[in-house]
Design a protein with these regions (language model features):
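N-terminal leader/targeting segments and the immediately adjacent pre-domain N-terminus
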Residues: 3-98, 122-127, 153, 157-158, ...
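Catalytic loop of the DD-peptidase/beta-lactamase superfamily, centered on the K-T-G motif
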Residues: 20-24, 44-86, 275-390
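Short active-site loop at a secondary-structure junction
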Residues: 67-71, 94-150, 207-216, 282-285, ...
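Short, solvent-exposed turn/loop segments enriched in Gly/Ser/Thr/Pro and often Arg
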Residues: 81, 133, 139-140, 255-262
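Short, surface-exposed loop or secondary-structure junction motifs
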Residues: 146-346, 350-351
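Hydrophobic (often cysteine-bearing) scaffold residues that line and stabilize catalytic clefts
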Residues: 56, 106, 110, 114, ...
Length: 390
């Protein structure tokens, strides 16, 4: 990832500015110079406020059409939509088209909500990222060695519980090994979550805590459990009450709270995923949303509406400087002041991006597995780079 960011940085054109000064012979000349400077500054501000992104819009739309893209991409600057594309079919059986407000599963983009939940609880004095896990999971063998921060930054060594495999031409994530005997399609949400937690807390660590980075969904499932333990609420209820409702995110929900495949406004997966286990995506890949709601959410992060600037800064910091891979808390810093995360769930792929200083948000999502992360997401990074260079 750092190699990718380095390549991105090499594409940035740095412009220098020179200044000159001149002696003023009279007060009136000084006054005129000041007026000219003010006028030029005002004109410059007006020009900056009216940046033209029509080329970026055209490039984005044409490229996505060439990909036969099915989904939505929206880029906003300071609350104004500057690029937006909605293409493809919401439901191939009916021919209904995707619209900007269509809902999608966002996969691991959900992790930033879990991280934000932890940061909110820390701000309220109800936990600390430096807390040892033994505080929340008494009797856990490695509870004295691991912290909440290790989970957030993917530096815990806790084993990944997913086995990735292709089943019926769908990339499906299955419970690993012995876990598949207790986490099943026939179980309830609570039964699967209890079985998963027990399994995770019995596994040996895959590396010494905080010695390296390894992406593991298990970290964020356990973080969601910590949110439940500390708040006394179900994780979904906590996120809904803390974020969805205050922000008016009425098109956002959780796959375990609804009959998600039959949501009327959901872009249907292009291939039916036959093995989606209830409960086990909690905190790591369980949110359904749309471009409207996600832009509101990303703006709230940028503007510190619900959590502080200190917390957001912690989320977009790099906790693995010794590694080629970069990770913060539920977000991946891009090395240029922004941060993003990808998401994957059955045939859905998503990307969310913020740049606090430039006041930029991007949300991109597809319901078609043909458009993997190396496809439309690279295009999104490219367009964002063009916008940042303006």
């Amino acid at each position: 990832m750092k190699k990718f960011i380095s390549l991105m940085l090499s594409a940035v054109i740095l412009a220098g500015a020179s200044a000159c000064s001149a002696n003023q012979s009279t007060n009136s000349e000084a006054s005129q110079s000041s007026a000219d400077t003010t006028a030029a500054s005002t004109a410059g501000q007006a020009t900056e406020a009216k940046k033209d992104y029509s080329e970026e819009q055209k490039q984005l739309e044409n490229s996505l059409k060439q990909m036969n893209f099915s989904g939505v991409v929206r880029i906003t600057e300071n609350g104004e939509t500057i690029c937006e594309v909605a293409l493809g079919k919401k439901d191939s059986s009916t021919g209904e088209e995707i619209k900007p407000g269509t809902q999608f599963c966002v996969g691991s983009v959900s992790k930033q909500f879990t991280a934000a939940s932890i940061m909110l609880l820390q701000e309220e004095g109800r936990l600390s990222v430096d807390d040892k896990l033994e505080k929340y999971f008494p009797g856990y063998k490695y509870g004295k060695d691991l912290t909440v921060k290790n989970l957030l930054s993917m530096r815990s060594g806790i084993a990944e519980f997913y086995d990735a495999d292709y089943i019926d031409n769908v990339y499906t994530e299955l419970p690993a090994g012995e876990l598949s005997k207790t986490v099943t399609n026939g179980a309830t949400v609570e039964q699967n979550q209890k079985a998963l937690e027990s399994w995770l807390l019995e596994q040996p660590l895959t590396f010494k805590p905080d010695s390296t980075f390894t992406y593991s969904n298990s970290n964020y499932f356990l973080l969601a459990r910590i949110v439940e333990i500390v708040s006394g609420k179900k994780y979904n209820a906590f996120v809904r009450e803390s974020f969805f409702e205050p922000l008016g995110m009425k098109s956002s929900t959780f796959i375990d709270d609804v009959d998600w495949k039959n949501l009327p406004n959901l872009a249907k997966p292009t291939v039916d995923a036959k093995t989606v286990y209830v409960g086990i995506t909690m905190g790591l890949g369980d949110i359904i949303s749309n471009a409207d709601d996600m832009d509101v959410w990303l703006t709230s992060l940028r503007t510190n509406k619900l959590i502080s600037a200190k917390s957001v800064d912690a989320m977009i910091a790099d906790y693995s400087p010794e590694d080629d891979l970069v990770y913060g808390y539920g977000l991946i810093p891009d090395g240029m002041g922004g941060a993003f995360h990808y998401g994957y769930f059955t045939t859905y792929h998503a990307m969310a991006y913020i740049h606090p200083e430039k006041k930029l948000n991007l949300f991109a999502v597809t319901n078609d597995d043909a458009h993997a992360e190396g496809d439309f997401t690279q295009l999104c990074h490219y367009v964002i780079q063009h916008i940042l260079d303006k």
